[in-house]
Amino acid sequence: MADTQDNRPGEEEDDDEEIDESAYKTMKDAVLFAIDVSPSMLERPPKTEDKKADRDSPTSAALKCAYQLMQQRIISNPNDMMGILLFGTEKTDLKDGDSTFQHCYLLADLDVPSAQDVKRLRDLVEDEEEAEQILKPAKDGASIATVLFCANQIFTTKAPNFSSRRLFLVTDNDYPVNVKADKDTAVTRARDLYDLGCTIDLFPISQPDQTFDRSRFYDDLVYPTSPSDPDAPIAVATTTKVAKSGEGITLLKQLISSINSKATPRRALFSLPLELGPDLRIGVKGYILIKRQEHAKSCYVWVGGDKPQIVSSSTSHMADDTARVVEKTELRKAYKFGGDAITFTPDEIIKIRQAFGDPIIRIIGFKPISCLPIWTNTNKATFIYPSEADFIGSTRVFSALQQKLLKSKKMGLVWFIARRNAAPILSALIPAEEQTNEDGEQAMPPGLWLVPLPWADDIRQFPSPAADVLKTTDALTDKMRIIIEQLQLPKGVYDPAKYPNPDLQWFYRILQAMALEEELPEKPDDKTMPKFRQIDKRCGEYITEYGAEFEAAFAQLAVSTFPHRGKRASADPGDDKPAPKRVKKEPKVKEEGEDDEGLTDEQMATVNNKGQISKQTVAVLKAWLSQRGESTSGKKADLVERVQGYLEGKGL
């Protein structure tokens, strides 16, 4: 999810709104990687001929994953902290000379990542010799209780006031203790972390000869998320999918996929009461689950010194005539009525803006869901989910409402005020079923969607349809169906995560190169470009057949539709209208520069530059090519391509 400040509705924002900023404050996030360095985690998978097989050890894959996440955060979240703690190492180093936590090595201290931190981690990932010096496993290993206590101290000293603090634990050992007393100590240390406001996210790794079993130890250590948890109120999979080393899909990709799903904490857009009737309210939270990602201009950077620094900005108002700084108490709001500026006091402005009451979601009726056309959507839909923070029992009532709407195939019509000073809107309350992926894991939780409905002046009139509409034939439809079937995405599902915005990625890549003092890339990596070779291999023959069928159908349609030239029709004896006069046609004057053999090279180049070359007839194109000794075989598209190639060779 995007940051809360990006999710705030922008249509009614105003600088002087007196709203509760506690719900919208910028929430800083601190992530500490704890990566196990044991002999099994350092063991590389056996070599195979499969090009997609693993090449990295689990520890190396985890470090590369942390490196990629640090690269992303240095641009997208410049105020968030990130650190890397290795445990089970032969060396003990916490950057402060403290040797209390044995076999714990703080590779990157919990702090806002700098360019030097990213470079050092990159060198460690790419340089095997340097990695071998640090990644030496201890004989006895590290106690998991020591690791959790060390993480507690790091969070307490480095990020004491952060609203989100998370420990990413990467290991393949599903029972890291020897006796039950060690397990009790570890559970106590984990509870201390949770009491501190930190969360533990486990990223388990299964070896080829051993499956990771959470129930042996980590089910008592890692608490699952629940709807009542304010940091993760949306019910997601309580456990992360186990990554398997040595498979065709690399371990690195599995780890990146798992960590990206938890890389950004879920933050509520709003927390409001949902009123089902008089004196019947429940608590809900709203989330923007799908949002267009745009360029994040989160801060200004000053590059005039020895190193770039984030600018702390401030705003002040100045009078035009005297350049005197105007205090906020001296400012007045004014609106023009009839050419005169009418001023209002701050209290009057507040009364005007809050005339519709407090923020609320109020159900005013129900309608069949079939009454809602697909185009009635004026803004981003908001997903709402129950919250027990303000009203106990909200989850049960919310679930009953959602199931009843699904069963009855109905939707709710609601009066929706998102926040104070916001204009009310009418929205449709649409139920959503739970969606699961092929592994049975939850892809989308059950809940309700708030879809903003248009007012009367938001609806535009459809343009008048064309008089003569050419319709396709059944033969063309059948041939196109074959082409579409060959171009289906895997399992017929579009996954936006596989096709990142190329413009946005290029923007981030340039910023990353500037921040890390690297060479600027030459061209972007655009995964939205069609795979032409694969398309031609799959259905090139079918496309050719479709083109031939299309030309035949169009020729037959032209013969049956367009009138033929023939003798002048005789006048109807019963027609009283006078016959139209024949207009004498003037002989066509040959244009200057055009010879008897058709268009010159310069004229054809001009037509091509205007994008009108495809409007030339086949006869004209063939004659032009024939005069220049070029082949005239093929379809019109081939002729056009041949003409353009000839002009390009001439430099026109």
From Swiss-Prot:
Acidic residues bias (residue ranges): 11-21
Give an example GO cellular component term for this record: Ku70:Ku80 complex
For the keyword Repeat, the answer is no
Q: Which CDD domains match?
A: KU70, vWA_ku
EC number from the UniProt entry: 3.6.4.12
Q: Where is the composition biased (Polar residues)?
A: 603-612
Q: Where are the annotated segments for Disordered?
A: 1-22, 38-59, 565-612
* Ranges of Basic and acidic residues composition bias in the record: 1-10, 44-57
Give any GO molecular function from the UniProt entry: DNA helicase activity
The main place the protein resides is nucleus
Q: Which family does it belong to?
A: Belongs to the ku70 family.
Spell out the protein name for this chain.
ATP-dependent DNA helicase II subunit 1
Q: Which organism is it from?
A: Phaeosphaeria nodorum (strain SN15 / ATCC MYA-4574 / FGSC 10173) (Glume blotch fungus)
